[in-house]
Structures are given as C-alpha cells and as structure tokens.
Amino acid sequence: MGWLDFSSKSKKEEKDDTRPSFTWGDNLNATDWQHYTDPRTVIPTILLTTTILVSTRLYRSYLRRIPEAAYIRPGFFRKRSLFGTVTRVGDADNFHLFHTPGGRLAGWGWMPGRKKLPEGKDLKNKTIHVRIAGVDAPEGAHFGKPAQPFSAEALAWLREYIQNRRVRAYIYKRDQYDRVVATVWVRRFLVRKDVGKEMLRAGMATVYEAKMGAEFGDFEAQYRAIEEEAKKKKLGMWSGKKKDYESPRDYKTRTANAAKMLK
C-alpha cells in the first residue's frame, strides 16, 4: 500500500491559487462606481439639484426684498411689478414704498420678523421712491419757491388714498432723481384702482406734459380722456378761472428760468 501524499494540493486548490489576492487596504479604498449610476441614487440627486436651482431662481426673481430703487435690476423694468406698503407720501405725485414681495403668502403682516414693518428712522435706506407715471400734480413749496394752487389739496388727497395701504407698482424705468416711474394700483373697497387715473378724475393732477421721458404704460389715451372730463366738470385744479391756470409743467419751467436769471 502506497503512502498518501498529504503535501500535494488538489486540483481545486491549485485553481484557486490562480485568483488575484486582495489586501484590506484594497477593499477600504475601492470605489463602487455602480453606486453612483444606480437609478435609486441618480434620480433623487437630480430632483434635489433641480429643486435647489428652481427655488434659488424663484427667490431671486420674486421673493427677495428690494430695499431701494438703485437695487432694481434693469431686466425688471417693464417686466415685473413691485408689491408693498406705502410708508410716506412726501409729494402729490410720488411716495415711498416698503417692498414686501409675496405679500401675506410670504409671511408679511403675520410671520415673526415680518409681522410689523419698520417705522421712522428704521426705514432709512429701506424704501423705494416711486413716481406715479403719466400724471403731474401741482407743485408744493420747495427750495424757496411758492406753492401752486391746489398743491396742498392734491397732497392731502394722495395721502388719504394710499398712505399705509398695500399697492402694486408696474415699473417702467428709473428717472434722473433715482425714483422708479410706475403705474400704481391700489385696492379700494375690494376694487383695484389706478392711482394716476383717480388723481386725474378728481382734478388733482394733469396729464404729464414733458416732451421727453413721459411714461404712460398703455393708458395715455385714457388719461387724456379722463382729464378732459375733469376739466368739463371743473373739478379740483380746474375749478378756478382759466386765465389764472398754470400747469405744473409751465410752473416748473417758469421758476427754473427765473432761478437761472438770478445766477
């Protein structure tokens, strides 16, 4: 009987020896690329990235608060509107707006941190100066110049109409005084009203007469028709004698020329 050779390897063991050997370091540093191409990983990643990009764009375009007119991007003009609260009416055809993008849906008026708007000195550098498009109100007393007739009445009218109210301004451009020229709408008794039209209707303003830079949106013809109606009814600034009437544009031209002559 022959001796069994225990030192010899079976064919299976010899075959196994041909497999490459791995170390623990290889296993720890190995990259499982299949994990990154697995639909269970790819699809959630794409959805999350898309959501972040869309949310960022939505915030920048519609929900980011604009503190002053200088911060309005050129691409916004004639394409976007500004919603906010009128904090101050300093003149009869312009006012200051605290921008509240998204309105109550974005938490303005009820959410902590947005429940109450700033007041007084806290509003400095936080409001947008808005010039109402298409109309010109009687000039108040400025820089030593006398006030025009009905300037006080026009200012009081505008304050009563929009002060502390939420308005929407459809913006056209920024003027030389860093004001935003806009058609402004306000809700009065649940009805949206064009503030410029209502000023003309009440005889508290004229149609803007400047030869250059006038902005009306699509309402110039309507504005002129409403002005003519107020003239016929002798409302507001049209109630005096025709010979005594001086338009805001003529007043500004006359006082500017007088100031030049004094230099």
UniProtKB/Swiss-Prot annotation:
One of its GO terms (cellular component) is membrane. Ca(2+) binds at D136. SUPFAM superfamilies: Staphylococcal nuclease (SSF50199). It is a single-pass membrane protein. This is Probable endonuclease lcl3. Keywords: Calcium, Endonuclease, Hydrolase, Membrane, Metal-binding, Mitochondrion, Nuclease, Transmembrane, Transmembrane helix. The active site is at R131, E139, R179. Its main location: mitochondrion. Residues 1-21, 236-263 are annotated as: Disordered. Pfam families: SNase. Its EC number is 3.1.-.-. Residues 8-19, 241-253 have a biased composition (Basic and acidic residues). The gene is lcl3. Belongs to the LCL3 family. InterPro entries: SNase_OB-fold_sf (IPR035437), Staphylococal_nuclease_OB-fold (IPR016071). The chain crosses the membrane at residues 41-59. One of its GO terms (molecular function) is metal ion binding. It comes from the Eukaryota. It is an enzyme of class 3 (hydrolase). It is found in: Mitochondrion; Membrane. Residues 80-240 form the TNase-like domain.
